[in-house]
Design a protein with these regions (language model features):
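Conserved active-site and SAM-binding loop architecture
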Residues: 1-72
Length: 72
């Protein structure tokens, strides 16, 4: 099952879902220090620094990943 993680922070939730067998397609966070730590923790997928308050832009960015589930 393909998952996108919103407000991902350093990746704790992503790690839990990954360990449970889910495929993390992408992650999003706005805070640059968290994004940098996430990038160090995960190399199998991208994290995007993005303000998700613009919901239309966020949906346009997330939908190409075709997630089965959005977590965060």
């Amino acid at each position: 099952m393909k998952v996108v993680d919103l407000f991902a922070g350093c990746g704790g939730l992503s790690l839990g879902f990954q360990n449970a067998g889910y495929e993390i397609a992408a992650a999003y966070d706005f805070w640059l220090p968290a994004v940098n730590v996430y990038r160090e923790n995960f190399t199998s997928h991208s994290i995007y620094q993005m303000d998700l308050s613009d919901t239309e832009a966020a949906v346009r960015h997330i939908m190409p990943f075709a997630p089965d589930m959005i977590i965060g």
